[in-house]
Amino acid sequence: MTLETAFMLPVQDAQHSFRRLLKAMSEPGVIVALHQLKRGWQPLNIATTSVLLTLADNDTPVWLSTPLNNDIVNQSLRFHTNAPLVSQPEQATFAVTDEAISSEQLNALSTGTAVAPEAGATLILQVASLSGGRMLRLTGAGIAEERMIAPQLPECILHELTERPHPFPLGIDLILTCGERLLAIPRTTHVEVC
């Protein structure tokens, strides 16, 4: 069995990462950095690995897309978080993928129900860059007036964000990661292409 390292100071590092994630989720579009790890569990980047170490546990099934799924990641995730790994995206609380995500995989993610909207999945999407893409205007909770971002996104994700095909409060929350940095776009955020 080959394992990757986790946080050096598990409690303090997880608390720090949680506070940074809370900032990102409560202030959509704000980029935060997670510096607790020296490296991610390849092919996962530092931010994705940190999010999983901070949020995943035995009650949160994790789905890893094929490009990001390997034995070392699986063993490390099971050992450090005890999170169950699932083979289908619709079973996941946390879905982890990269820009190769298909519309079918995205549409399979749980969006919750009217009775249990919190059952909607969180999609952790590794992107090439958090800048240099189409300019997006974010409005809504946690944003004073508007916030502009330009991450490089696959078309299916852009469509999901701008169309929001599910009535609120249903939907998915999105965390975009690149290296040790991330930004979040919760389902409460309204997104427009500029």
UniProtKB/Swiss-Prot annotation:
Family note: Belongs to the PhnH family.
Assigned GO CC terms: alpha-D-ribose 1-methylphosphonate 5-triphosphate synthase complex; carbon phosphorus lyase complex
A Pfam family it matches: PhnH
Swiss-Prot/TrEMBL catalytic activity: methylphosphonate + ATP = alpha-D-ribose 1-methylphosphonate 5-triphosphate + adenine
E.C. designation(s): 2.7.8.37
Quaternary structure and partners: Homodimer. Forms a complex with PhnG, PhnI, PhnJ and PhnK with the suggested composition PhnG(4)H(2)I(2)J(2)K.
Lineage: Bacteria, Pseudomonadati, Pseudomonadota, Gammaproteobacteria, Enterobacterales
The encoding gene: phnH
Stated role: Together with PhnG, PhnI and PhnL is required for the transfer of the ribose triphosphate moiety from ATP to methyl phosphonate.
Name of the protein in question: Alpha-D-ribose 1-methylphosphonate 5-triphosphate synthase subunit PhnH
Transmembrane among keywords: no
GO molecular function: alpha-D-ribose 1-methylphosphonate 5-triphosphate synthase activity; identical protein binding; protein homodimerization activity
Keywords: Transferase
Keyword Lipid biosynthesis appears in the UniProt entry: no
Note: The sequence shown is that of strains K12 and B.
GO biological process: organic phosphonate catabolic process; organic phosphonate metabolic process; organic phosphonate transport
Enzyme's top EC category: transferase
InterPro entries xrefs: PhnH-like_sp, Phosphonate_metab_PhnH
SUPFAM superfamilies tied to this protein: PhnH-like
